[in-house]
């Protein structure tokens, strides 16, 4: 796991805790923000594991609930009757064969109208019963499929959450490194110092949106990306955009990644028209 990626994540978690009014934060206050961000990651790990365990338990419960439906579907028996669906279909087929024979005899001129009507009625009843049985079977199978689909989805979610949780110990270990915390502090300090200019820059490339109406997570991700791309100039545009998109995938809603990607690419395209001031201070020697 890359140190700078962890630093970006810490900074994102710390942005939400920045005071709205303080003009300048002390280094101690910023350090406290990062410690709070690390604690948030630890809590997220426990929550992720708990959620995964709950999803696995629900999957197991659903599988047990599906057992009676599977048995009912395999039996495919009518309420109050012992004949299987196959027997009922065979019965209907025999009635139809008898009816066909009677019709042939009728064409020969020797027919009994009452017998024809009775055979037709019997065939109709048999087919109706078979149709109802098929409908009941289809309903049971649909219920089983729905349950199994939910089990698969829950299992997939649990696997994904476990994958995230397994990466957390490494992330938490790297987050304690001095170089990681130093870069996260650098991002937070630059964001706090240049917040108004950053917001104006972003508003200039938003199409049909007001920055204040953008979701908090997406807005903070965009701000940190501008810090890297146009204030610290510590990462190439492509790297900063890709990293911002990854943060949006992890912390934003399903549309967040595409939104962040589009805004930042428009920002790069507009740079020749509205260049941002270069910060003369070095960005450090961390590599993305």
Curated annotation (Swiss-Prot):
GO biological process assignments: DNA-templated transcription termination; transcription antitermination
Keyword field contains Glycoprotein: no
InterPro entries noted in UniProt: NusB-like_sf, NusB_fam, NusB_RsmB_TIM44
GO MF annotations, alphabetized: RNA binding
Key words, A-Z: RNA-binding, Transcription, Transcription antitermination, Transcription regulation
Cellular component annotations (GO), alphabetically ordered: cytosol
Disulfide bonds: none
Family: Belongs to the NusB family.
Role played: Involved in transcription antitermination. Required for transcription of ribosomal RNA (rRNA) genes. Binds specifically to the boxA antiterminator sequence of the ribosomal RNA (rrn) operons.
Name of protein: Transcription antitermination protein NusB
């Amino acid at each position: 796991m890359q140190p700078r990626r962890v630093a970006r994540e810490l900074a994102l978690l710390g942005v939400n805790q920045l005071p709205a009014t303080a003009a300048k934060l002390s280094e101690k206050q910023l350090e406290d923000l990062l410690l709070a961000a690390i604690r948030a990651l630890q809590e997220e790990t426990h929550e992720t594991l708990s959620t995964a365990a709950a999803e696995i338990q629900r999957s197991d419960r659903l599988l047990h609930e599906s057992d009676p439906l599977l048995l009912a579907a395999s039996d495919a028996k009518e309420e109050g009757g012992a004949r299987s669906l196959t027997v009922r279909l065979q019965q209907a087929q025999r009635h139809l064969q008898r009816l066909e024979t009677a019709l042939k005899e009728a064409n020969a001129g020797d027919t009994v109208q009452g017998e024809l009507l009775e055979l037709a009625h019997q065939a109709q009843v048999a087919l109706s019963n078979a149709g109802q049985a098929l409908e009941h079977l289809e309903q049971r199978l649909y219920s089983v499929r729905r349950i199994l689909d939910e089990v698969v989805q829950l299992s997939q979610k649990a696997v994904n959450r476990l994958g995230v949780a397994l990466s957390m110990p490494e992330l938490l270990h790297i987050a304690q490194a001095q170089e990681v915390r130093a870069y996260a502090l650098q991002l937070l300090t630059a964001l706090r110092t240049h917040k108004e200019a950053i917001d104006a820059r972003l508003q200039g490339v938003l199409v049909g949106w007001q920055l204040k109406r953008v979701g908090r997570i997406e807005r903070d991700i965009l701000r940190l990306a501008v810090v890297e791309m146009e204030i610290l100039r510590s990462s190439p545009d492509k790297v900063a955009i890709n990293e911002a998109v990854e943060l949006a995938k992890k912390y934003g809603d399903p549309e967040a990644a595409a939104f962040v990607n589009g805004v930042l690419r428009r920002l790069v395209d507009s740079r020749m028209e509205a260049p941002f001031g270069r910060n003369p201070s070095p960005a450090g020697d961390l590599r993305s």
